[in-house]
Swiss-Prot record:
GO terms for biological process: translation. Pfam families: Ribosomal_L19. This is Large ribosomal subunit protein bL19. One of its GO terms (molecular function) is structural constituent of ribosome. This protein is located at the 30S-50S ribosomal subunit interface and may play a role in the structure and function of the aminoacyl-tRNA binding site. One of its GO terms (cellular component) is cytosolic large ribosomal subunit. Keywords: Ribonucleoprotein, Ribosomal protein. NCBIfam families: rplS_bact (TIGR01024). Belongs to the bacterial ribosomal protein bL19 family.
Length: 180
């Protein structure tokens, strides 16, 4: 493995550690959450459409999502490892026999529809994704609970220290009063 491939693999691993993308292919309907910066404000925008192509490899991999917005076809290319892509959610699995669905550009209405894939592989992928999402939610919930408990313990310790300091101050005052 040469140096460039090694660096690309390291970069891909660090990005995948931060967020994981589900397994998807052309024909699947995706909801891509993208970070958009307008002026000095940043927000997350959902872009939902059909994945019509995946191209490239390693760190240069990208996918094209097509949607119809107000009667106009809009295509957007997203790099898989872009930091602007917050998350990708598979809304529906499509059953197609091509890797590039560019023919959808010329189609309108029913002829542009993609049949939903209800095969066992798609079902397994959906189940595994649901399990992974549930696991992620449980992990985040556990982190929230642990943070809340740590905050409560910190507050209790601060209150106990405050009470101890107040008791010491009273004892000191009482000692001064009895010494007079």
């Amino acid at each position: 493995m040469n140096i460039i491939q090694q660096l690309e693999a390291e970069q891909a691993a660090t990005i995948e550690a931060k967020r994981t993308l589900p397994e998807f292919s052309p024909g699947d309907t995706l909801r891509v959450n993208v970070r958009v910066t307008e002026g000095n404000r940043t927000r997350v925008q959902a872009y939902e459409g059909v994945c019509i192509a995946r191209s490239g490899g390693s760190i240069n991999e990208s996918f094209t999502v097509r949607k119809i917005s107000y009667g106009e076809g809009v295509e957007r290319v997203f790099p898989v490892y872009s930091p602007l892509v917050e998350s990708v959610e598979v809304v529906r699995r499509g059953k197609v026999r091509r890797a590039k669905l560019y023919y959808l550009r010329d189609r309108r209405g029913k002829s542009a529809r993609i049949v939903e894939n209800t095969g066992t592989r798609a079902r397994k992928l959906n189940d595994s994704e649901r399990a992974a999402l549930a696991e992620e939610k449980a992990r985040l919930e556990a982190e929230k609970v642990a943070a809340a408990q740590a905050l409560a313990a910190e507050k209790a310790a601060a209150e106990a220290a405050e009470k101890a300091a107040a008791a010491e101050a009273e004892a000191a005052k009482a000692a001064e009063g009895s010494a007079e």
